[in-house]
């Protein structure tokens, strides 16, 4: 495809009463190739239709330029046809006459017979031969929109522009017209730009989906490539492995924009009380069993006990929401996968590094690797069986789900695969999927398995759609699971609040560890505010003799909660091993700043937990394969691993200034 439409640094303002201006779009850059179908999606008021009008020439930009085939667009033209949500048909003309009016005006140089043939061709193209002589009053809404599409295509435009063309139609008619438009565009290689609010419509029709942020000053927040091959059929699209991940990405973006809008609309002030710099905290979490300490601290008033009497727990659907919440400053703290503090501190999220402090390990264990029942039915019961299957079906794509690159799920799954001579990037494909979606994807057959925290392994086993092929007891018993994370600048600004937060959660961890509290804990976690799942799927166990499918969370005990720099270093090496981040040349400095043992020790000492303060973990990091981790020479350790990507070593500058939310 060659470059066809260029939108270059567009800015568009509209005058307001009183001499003011409203900035609708700012800094829009977009290149469209010939034959592409582009969808523009975003909340109302984000400038989707404004951008479409600029491409159509119905509006002119305040700054920047739009060009078609190298020619700047300065006015409407017949090379660009717009199909609006309203049908815009002349009520006194028939279907044939409405189309002919446009054809006769635009293609006037063609012989009459040829123009008539074009009209008839496009009437048949949209399936309206039986209604060609009817006026609009005798047509349904879907038929009227077909006339509008036929009229737009009949003039042979270079670019078809659609402004929510199916928004006013019922679901059945909308679905039929989407299929028809997709067929027409594919068969005729039409270049199209469409405005839509419909996520499924965007995925079905588009080659790329452009997501616009909220206005004023709306910009492109992201562009998704739709890797679903053409020609497409609706059910093939729904069952394609990329469908749910694309859909989830768009929904996540739209939900984040909605949240940002709400946050911008309210004025948040820092509330200091009880000798603490801030007591009104927003703490993020993802609904997994490992969030139990946060739920207990809230429901059993441990937060309030330690002076944090205005805590709100913010439920996120994915770990990306946690990253965005800390990056954008609308979360004070968060439950995190154990590898995320290091990952963000070295810049894994993109952009400059964001130092994250971890002063508490909230849970250990609680993960598992699940494969589909379909694989079990094929005789896959061990990792050797799985490896043999992969080698015998090398031409087939095998997909495993993970929740985030920095999660222990990803690091443990990759380690387990590589230690069993399975390359996690070449023999399988790892796909990032929100935790709650894993089971649905496994059931639907779009993935072959996943590594995730509970209750999703137990859920799959009890629903008989998957089986646990390996638990964390087998891979690394006692590995860090979830940690408390805060921004370093937040920790420095609110040191007393930070200690109070660790104290409250440390008490909550001890509560969660006590088997006498597990029945109540199951009730709390199953509530719709938290995990929103049947409590029979929420199981706890401290016995390693139990079935491997039973979770073995550890929330407290000797060495459970104290953060370990050696463990963080191991995670740092694994992230570098697979090319997610460079290995930091200044790794000692980064570990000292990420792993704040002093804050943990202060909190534990003030709670009277001297045995926790004085405990020193003596067991080295060693996983199931018996390969010792060389914490003295991590580069040599990385080079000794038989399967790894080419990794780089770089100095990571942590002291670049970043704004923190104003008090």
Curated annotation (Swiss-Prot):
Q: What is its main location?
A: membrane
Q: Which organism is it from?
A: Synechococcus elongatus (strain ATCC 33912 / PCC 7942 / FACHB-805) (Anacystis nidulans R2)
- All copies of domain ABC transporter, residue ranges: 5-239
The name on file for this protein is Bicarbonate transport ATP-binding protein CmpC
Topology in membrane? Peripheral membrane protein
Q: Which Gene3D superfamilies match?
A: P-loop containing nucleotide triphosphate hydrolases, Periplasmic binding protein-like II
The UniProt function text for this chain reads: Part of the ABC transporter complex CmpABCD involved in bicarbonate transport. Responsible for energy coupling to the transport system.
Q: Where in the cell is it found?
A: Cell inner membrane
Gene that this sequence comes from: cmpC
Subunit organization: The complex is composed of two ATP-binding proteins (CmpC and CmpD), a transmembrane protein (CmpB) and a solute-binding protein (CmpA).
Q: Where does ATP bind?
A: 42-49
Q: Which family does it belong to?
A: Belongs to the ABC transporter superfamily. Nitrate/nitrite/cyanate uptake transporter (NitT) (TC 3.A.1.16) family.
How is this protein annotated for GO cellular component? plasma membrane
Q: Where is this region: CmpA-like?
A: 281-663
The record, for Pfam families, names:
ABC_tran, NMT1_2
Read off the InterPro entries from this record.
AAA+_ATPase, ABC_SmlMolc_Importer, ABC_transporter-like_ATP-bd, ABC_transporter-like_CS, NO3_transporter_ATP-bd-like, NrtA/CpmA_ABC-bd_dom, P-loop_NTPase
Query: Can you name one GO molecular function term for this protein?
Result: ATP hydrolysis activity
Alphabetically, which GO biological process terms does the record hold?
Answer: monoatomic ion transport
Q: Which SMART domains match?
A: AAA (SM00382)
Q: Which top class of enzyme applies to this chain?
A: translocase
Reported EC number(s) for this entry are 7.6.2.-
Keywords associated with the record: ATP-binding, Cell inner membrane, Cell membrane, Ion transport, Membrane, Nucleotide-binding, Translocase, Transport
Q: What is the induction note for this entry?
A: By carbon dioxide-limited conditions, probably via CmpR.
Tell me the domain of life: Bacteria
């Amino acid at each position: 495809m060659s470059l066809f439409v260029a939108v270059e640094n567009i800015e568009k303002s509209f005058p307001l009463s009183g001499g003011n201006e409203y900035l609708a779009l700012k800094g829009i850059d977009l290149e469209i190739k010939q034959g592409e179908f582009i969808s523009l999606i975003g909340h109302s008021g984000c400038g989707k239709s404004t951008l479409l009008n600029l491409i159509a020439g119905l509006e002119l930009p305040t700054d920047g330029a739009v060009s078609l085939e190298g020619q700047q667009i300065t006015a409407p033209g017949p090379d660009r046809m717009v199909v609006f949500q309203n049908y815009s048909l002349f009520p006194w003309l028939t279907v044939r006459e409405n189309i002919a009016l446009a054809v006769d005006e635009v293609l006037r140089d063609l012989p009459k017979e040829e123009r008539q043939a074009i009209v008839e061709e496009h009437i048949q193209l949209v399936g309206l031969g039986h209604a060609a002589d009817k006026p609009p009053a005798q047509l349904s809404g879907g038929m009227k929109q077909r006339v509008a599409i036929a009229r737009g295509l009949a003039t042979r435009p270079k670019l078809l522009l659609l402004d929510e063309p199916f928004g006013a139609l019922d679901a059945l008619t909308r679905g039929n017209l989407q299929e028809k438009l997709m067929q027409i565009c594919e068969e005729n290689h039409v270049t199209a730009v469409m405005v839509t609010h419909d996520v499924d419509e965007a995925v079905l029709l588009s080659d790329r989906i452009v997501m616009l942020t909220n206005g004023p000053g709306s910009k492109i927040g992201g562009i998704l490539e739709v890797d679903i091959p053409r020609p497409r059929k609706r059910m093939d699209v729904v069952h394609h492995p990329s469908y749910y991940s694309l859909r989830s990405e768009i929904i996540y973006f739209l939900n984040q924009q909605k949240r940002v809008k709400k946050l911008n609309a309210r004025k948040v002030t820092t509330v200091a009380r009880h000798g603490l710099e801030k007591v009104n905290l927003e703490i993020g979490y993802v609904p997994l069993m490992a969030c139990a300490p946060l739920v207990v601290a809230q429901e059993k008033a441990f937060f309030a006990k330690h002076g944090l009497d205005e805590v709100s727990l913010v439920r996120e659907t994915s770990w990306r929401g946690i990253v965005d919440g800390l990056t954008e400053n609308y979360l004070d703290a968060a439950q995190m996968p154990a590898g995320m503090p290091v990952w963000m501190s070295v810049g894994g999220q993109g952009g400059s590094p964001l130092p994250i402090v971890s002063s508490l390990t909230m849970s250990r264990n609680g993960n598992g690797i699940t494969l589909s029942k379909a694989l079990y039915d094929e005789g896959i019961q061990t990792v050797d069986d799985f490896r043999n299957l992969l080698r015998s079906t090398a031409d087939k794509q095998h997909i495993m789900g993970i929740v985030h690159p920095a999660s222990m799920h990803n690091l443990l799954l990759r380690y387990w695969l590589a230690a069993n001579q399975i390359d996690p990037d070449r023999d399988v494909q790892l796909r990032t999927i929100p935790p709650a979606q894993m089971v649905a994807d496994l059931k639907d057959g779009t993935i072959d398995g996943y590594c995730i925290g509970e209750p999703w392994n137990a859920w799959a086993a009890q629903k008989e759609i998957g089986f646990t092929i390996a638990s964390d007891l087998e891979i690394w018993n006692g590995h860090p699971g979830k940690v408390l994370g805060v921004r370093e600048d937040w920790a420095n600004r609110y040191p007393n609040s930070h200690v109070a937060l660790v104290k409250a959660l440390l008490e909550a961890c001890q509560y969660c560890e006590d088997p006498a509290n597990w029945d109540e804990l199951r009730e709390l976690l199953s509530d719709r505010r938290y995990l929103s799942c049947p409590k029979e799927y929420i199981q706890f166990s401290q016995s390693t003799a139990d079935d491997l499918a039973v979770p073995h969370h550890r929330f407290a005990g000797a060495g459970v909660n104290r953060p370990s720099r050696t463990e963080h270093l191991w995670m740092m090496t694994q992230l570098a091993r697979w090319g997610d981040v460079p290995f930091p040349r200044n790794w000692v400095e980064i570990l000292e700043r990420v792993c704040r043992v002093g804050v943990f020790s202060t909190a534990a000492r003030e709670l009277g937990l001297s045995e926790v303060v004085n405990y020193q973990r003596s067991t080295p990091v060693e996983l199931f394969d018996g390969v010792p981790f060389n914490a003295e020479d991590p580069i040599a350790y990385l080079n000794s691993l038989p399967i790894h990507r080419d990794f780089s070593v770089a100095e990571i500058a942590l002291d670049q200034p970043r704004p923190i939310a104003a008090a």
